[in-house]
Amino acid sequence: MSSIARPPDPCLVAIILIVRSRAGPRFVFHYPPNPLSDNGLKSAKKARRASRTKSTRSSDSSSSDDSGPTSDEDEEEHQRLQQQQQQQQAQQQSSHIAGQPLSVTHLAGSAVSRRSSNFGLDDHVGMAASPGGESARAGSIGSGRTLLRKRGGNSDVEDDAGTSSDRQDDAGSSAMGGGRKGGPPPWESLLGLPAKVWEKLLSPSRAWHKRRFEVGINDLGRKKKKKPRAERQGGELGHNEHTDDAREEADAGEELMVASTETLSPHQMSASESQRASIASSKTGRAPSESLDVDDKDRMTMFNVVFVLDPPLLEYSMRSREIYDNIIKKFAKALKWEQARTGYVWREAQHISHIKEKAKEKGTSVNALYTELINQSSLARAIYTVYTSIAASKIASVSLSPDVSISLQIPPLTSTPYLPGPTDEAYPGLWLTTADSVTPVDDPTANESTAPHQVLAKHFALLLLDSEATILKDVEASGGALAPALAHYIRCSKPTKSFAQISASSGIPLPTIQMLASHLVYWRRARAIPPLHQRDTYIVSPNCDLSKLDVATAAYQLAFPTLPSLPKMLSALSGTPRPYGSFIPSKDHKDAYFAILAWLLRGGWVTQLRSFSRVKVTPEIKMAVEVALRREEVDKYLSKRGNVSSDAGNRGDSSEHDDDDASSSSSSSLASQDSGEETPMPGRYKQDSELQLTRSLLDRNTSLKTSSLILFPHRASPLESRWMDEIVSRFPDNPRPARPGTEGDPEQAGLQTSLKQFWPTYIKYFNGYDALEKISVRENLKRKHVWQVLTRLGLVTGSQASLDLDPREQVLVSVRHW
């Protein structure tokens, strides 16, 4: 995996709607009409697939014996289809697609993925189940939990799979009329497979009720995530939960793999192809069986909304989980609600099917049909909106009815702590910072591999990503219960004030502020940042997008016409790092220059240069601790031996008053001790075990001749704790004043107070991950006071040349980065 954190990449190829009634499944709608065209697969996706490993299986070999023509007319038609397929392969390179499906019965959500395919007209269709957990790669999917030991609703796919090549049209004809004479229209095939195959493949039987599973189709590697919910006779969704033994599930999955592959792929397949044709499932529930009602054949019993994905192989699990958690589950839940309330999905499915039948009779073109569908069907329009918005990493605002409106998105990545390496794809303009990463102070169990995230703690501030007037206008126009509170908070919020400070000044409770700020961050209207301060240092970001400098310069000039231009500001910030306050010419310009800084941060032009430190342990400290530990060992040993000798003397005195036999026995025992022939007794060497803890502090691998760094003071080992105790013990109790005549000056308290008082407060930040700039905000201390203490401890600053520093207090090693 690349070291750079990638922005959201939904890898969305298509969305499919399938419903099933008592009469059988029905392929209702899909968007885009032809995912293989330039409109469906963006150039970026083509470039991404082109960089992956191409499949070694050609389209000719995969389709040569599929249809098996039995007449001259069939043979001529078969040859024509092969020529069309070869032309299609020449126009677009073989594709690599992976993804994750999920179908939902009464409200289904599925994600389908594809990989290494030419999308030929003759691809076999296969399904298999594996007993493993959720796979991390496409084509070998293994969430495999199945209870379906019989083929059930999928068993009849065999009838259509064998003749699939006879029903398919060339993908390039999707913009034309209703297809060849006597054949199905072009909108009844998708990704090289006819609608009949998709209908039965993506409409699982009732045994799959509320289960999430993935489907792989041949070397297309299409995966479908499904969470079917079956509808009861009363119109409600079933919620029965059933759990079986894990071994039974694994065995059933293996049976299903074979049965499904044979059912959907009647032709011969190689072993590698069979492995690619996989389906993995995760059971979530089962609905009770129902008897069919003759008068109820047209009632919908299930629907699936299937998402076809195209993630890179190494990002398969992450991308599929993102779209499942953020899009599919929420979209399916809204459809379930409307279907249960008003029969929305079934009504819209019938409406869409009616429009398609009329278009088929009239020979309407695909483009005209889809324009009509999107205009007349709210469900088709909703699927269109979800696809176009999510595929572009935007927010999808969907209105199913006057009462049900939802907004869907995959939360964007707003920052990265890494610069791209030589082999990494660069994302210029992404905010370069570690400020929103989890640190040991935020979470003591965190480590450097913890993924970055927005930490909306009380010491953060809010940076609006658009003008305040624009956001307020949108908030007021949207209405809703949160609108008044949001508008009030936005007016009170400033990027120079933390949430806690805003709460104190505005009277808004801190939890409310954090909730509102989180809402604005999630919906891409703001960003959580450390509060802007004139004593902080800001530099030009190494990840800024200089290709947009001309456009940004014009926008900057409109926003700040009387202030230095954008090139001049960037040039000034590119020099020797210094506090931002040194760029402000006067107090009257303070607000304007902070507005400039906020504008630069918003566009990723600058980033904060922050300081990080760790405690250094010198050889002198190590040797002093070593000597002290050995002295303690000797003292304990001598003390224990003295106690043993005293006990022996007491026993000798008391033996003189015993009878002769006892005296003889005691004398014999003492003689035995003197001769060294001691009788083994429990606990005789107990004193040695008492020294075990002390000896454990003496790490033989620790060099006493080199300095060491304490990586995590909050998780220090016993030996590291002794080192830090020795360091603190050497701090002077009465430090000399920095300058003559400043004794008792409150402004010099950080220079005149013993560091022993400050050490417990500051030590937790000396871990190399928490910026020292946090201390003043988190501990509610004056910045000047904090930097005085840090300077005494060894932080390299520009003002330390004027101070008389004590070498005994110089214990920090510091670095500076973003």
From Swiss-Prot:
Secretion signal span: 1-23
Superkingdom field: Eukaryota
Cellular component terms per the entry's GO annotation: GATOR1 complex
Feature: compositional bias, Low complexity: 56-67, 82-93, 663-674
This protein's record includes keyword Oxidoreductase: no
Keywords for the protein's UniProt record, in alphabetical order: Meiosis, Signal
Annotated spans, Disordered: 31-97, 118-188, 219-293, 640-685
InterPro entries, per database record: HTH_NPRL3, Npr3
GO biological process: cellular response to amino acid starvation; meiotic cell cycle; negative regulation of TORC1 signaling; positive regulation of autophagy; TORC1 signaling
Chain intervals with Polar residues compositional bias: 260-284
Biased composition (Basic residues): 43-55
Biased segments, Basic and acidic residues type: 230-245
Role noted for this protein: Mediates inactivation of the TORC1 complex in response to amino acid starvation. Required for meiotic nuclear division.
Family: Belongs to the NPR3 family.
Protein name: Nitrogen permease regulator 3
Organism: Aspergillus terreus (strain NIH 2624 / FGSC A1156)
